[in-house]
């Protein structure tokens, strides 16, 4: 088929991780378990933040938004992969592929911006503690989250519009478990040079900008902690941002690892395997990082579990 702007396609094939039939039940069980843990863990963080008045602070407001984004990122990719394994059908329609790309970029981009906002929140809390509640007022917090959603939505829309202009021929097999942007662009039989340039430019701008903000915030935080005289004061100050620093390291480290591994091996299946780190593993670990390191979250979750147990015992005794 000759490439051209009028080339019409209706579907792609998601090849997933392995073609071995014997591995499919194992992959289904593994990813279903990881997906359920991710959704449950992040839902508990959201419910604890909403229901406990002690957690109605800017830091936990941002954390609940991060948990929501984690649920959305995994829900964009994993259910479709599980359905494909269960039905032994690798087909995804062209429209569904575009929608999956749009929402994945939207939620992943939002996390990128939100982590920068959370770094700024920790910067204000440690470097300007007396003015923290004045600076991080509800209006500013809402505005920062709204701006993160808006920028991510516009970036995602730009990438989808760039894909729509491409023509596709007969090679419609995506060697991945979801419609990953680079993999889809590589299938195009029309010129995709502009697409790659837009990706490189926007990633450098919208990825490098927030990362620079995070590094700047933590440089100021480290300077402020270093100026504290007591060891207990230093530990208390550092503990307030340790969880966020762990999540940032995991998020950017996973993304960097994916692109370094794909550039080194040039193997699409290796890239798909590495992508599990930031699409599944990172969202799954985030609730554990925050709950294990945070006494307020553990207390709130403990109260809810205790209250749920007491209610269960009460209703069990009722005739």
Swiss-Prot record:
Keywords on record: Cell membrane, Disulfide bond, G-protein coupled receptor, Glycoprotein, Membrane, Olfaction, Receptor, Sensory transduction, Transducer, Transmembrane, Transmembrane helix
CC per GO annotation: membrane; plasma membrane
Alphabetized Pfam families for the sequence: 7tm_4
Membrane topology: Multi-pass membrane protein
Protein name per its UniProtKB record: Olfactory receptor 7A5
Location (main, coarse): membrane
Family: Belongs to the G-protein coupled receptor 1 family.
Bilayer-crossing regions: 26-46, 55-75, 100-120, 140-160, 198-217, 238-258, 272-292
Annotated glycosylation sites: 5
Taxonomic path: Eukaryota, Metazoa, Chordata, Craniata, Vertebrata
Membrane side Extracellular: residue ranges: 1-25, 76-99, 161-197, 259-271
Compartments, as annotated in UniProt: Cell membrane
Function: Odorant receptor.
One GO molecular-function entry: G protein-coupled receptor activity
This protein's encoding gene: OR7A5
Keyword field contains Protein biosynthesis: no
Disulfide linkage: 97-189
